[in-house]
Amino acid sequence: MKKNWYLIIAAILLVIGGITYGYHEYNKPKTAQELKTVRVAYLPITHALPVFATKELETADGPVHVELVKYGSWPELMDALNTGKVDAASVLVELGVKAREQGIDVRAAALGHTEGNIIIVNNDINSVQDLKGKSFAIPHKQSTQKILVDLMLEKAGLTEKDVQIVEMSPPEMPSALSVGQIAGYSVAEPFGSLALEMGTGKVFEDPDHLWHDNICCALVFNGQFVDEHHDLAKAFTKAYLDAGTYLDEHPKAQEEISSKYMKFNDSVIERSLKVIGFKDLALTEDRYNALVHHMTHIDLIKKVPSYSEFVDTSLLP
């Protein structure tokens, strides 16, 4: 009996010790690096290149330390952003607008790129009419790719009743096209260039002809992070925009950084970078209005967040 009491007391002391240790660990002063760390979520696509470049260009004595967090799907990434598991993300701008419409506090600061989307079909498709009765893939319903496909169909006098639109992870699209599971897809690079490299698809419509100056991914912050660490969020935004300028002025760096974060052949990376820009990353009111016009037109949103509700201009340099 006495032995049992010793075991009980020992267990209690162990629990108390663990709680005490955890308390001190939680409350111990943060290091200088921890105080300037921004956790940024991304998917490995060319649209996230400014995030990668921000990380590559950071210095030990700089104002920001970037902690990149890789995700495999947009829903998973968006959940992390909405719940504060990450502080910011390079994400489909439509997902950010939709979250804001739903009352979730996320705020955009800048675009991730200009252009950079591609529409691919298999080699037997020669007109939009040829897509009738076939499947066409997009990465997410709330996406510029979805808008582009709807505009393409509308231009040809077709609707989604004529073509089956399916959501599919971008890495799966080239192989799905090659085996005939889908007739085409709209996606962020480099997954379009990959199909061209494989010889299983061809470029179809020019996205810019469907929606001039179309926008896609954006730098979006968790609102609570901005409120609690406004200066840090602003410092990161400046570093991010500076990284975009650096990429625009150093094409070779685009290839080198892309190759580090995206495991594709050099020829795929090189081609994908020919159709994307990083110089003008401003999410202007005109660009936002065009975006929400298209989102409303195809019923992606019902209640449009105002520009000031979604874009936090206080974060701009």
Positions of predicted regions on the chain:
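Conserved C-terminal helix/tail region of periplasmic/extracytoplasmic solute-binding proteins
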Residues: 296-317
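Solvent-exposed, polar/charged alpha-helical surfaces in well-ordered, non-transmembrane soluble domains
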Residues: 49-53, 79, 83, 97, ...
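Short, solvent-exposed loop/beta-turn-alpha elements that line the ligand-binding surface or hinge
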Residues: 58-64, 209-211, 278-285
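Secondary-structure end/capping motifs
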Residues: 227-302
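Ligand-binding clefts/hinges and TM-proximal coupling segments of bilobed small-molecule sensing domains
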Residues: 18-23, 65, 144-164, 238-268, ...
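Pocket-lining segment of extracytoplasmic ligand-binding domains
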Residues: 93-95, 166, 171-258
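Short, glycine-/small- and polar/acidic-enriched structural segments
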Residues: 23-158, 164-167, 183-189, 200-203, ...
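N-terminal Sec-pathway targeting helices
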Residues: 1-12
